[in-house]
């Protein structure tokens, strides 16, 4: 469960099924779904089956250490 200060992300799910945690709400996701994650939104994804998705990042700076980690319980 993480958030970014400087970047937005768009995830497009190509194959598989999973659960998306986005700002405390859980949603089933799968093939054909697209999710827009704005900077500051807490997010994580868990595969029910093997997941394949494309992530596109935008913002500045796009750096590896632009991540803040948070505790998350998938049973919430």
Predicted regions and their residues:
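Double-stranded beta-helix
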Residues: 44, 48-76
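Beta-strand-connecting loop/turn residues
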Residues: 16, 25, 49-50
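Short beta-strand His + acidic residue motifs that chelate non-heme Fe in jelly-roll/DSBH
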Residues: 1-2, 20-21, 37, 42-48, ...
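Short acidic-glycine-tyrosine-enriched beta hairpin
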Residues: 10, 24-42
């Amino acid at each position: 469960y993480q958030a970014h200060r400087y970047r937005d992300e768009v995830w497009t799910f190509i194959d598989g099924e999973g659960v998306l945690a986005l700002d405390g709400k859980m949603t089933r996701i799968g093939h054909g779904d697209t999710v827009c994650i704005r900077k500051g939104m807490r997010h994580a994804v868990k595969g029910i089956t093997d997941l394949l998705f494309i992530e596109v990042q935008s913002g500045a700076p796009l750096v590896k250490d632009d991540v803040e980690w948070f505790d998350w319980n998938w049973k919430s």
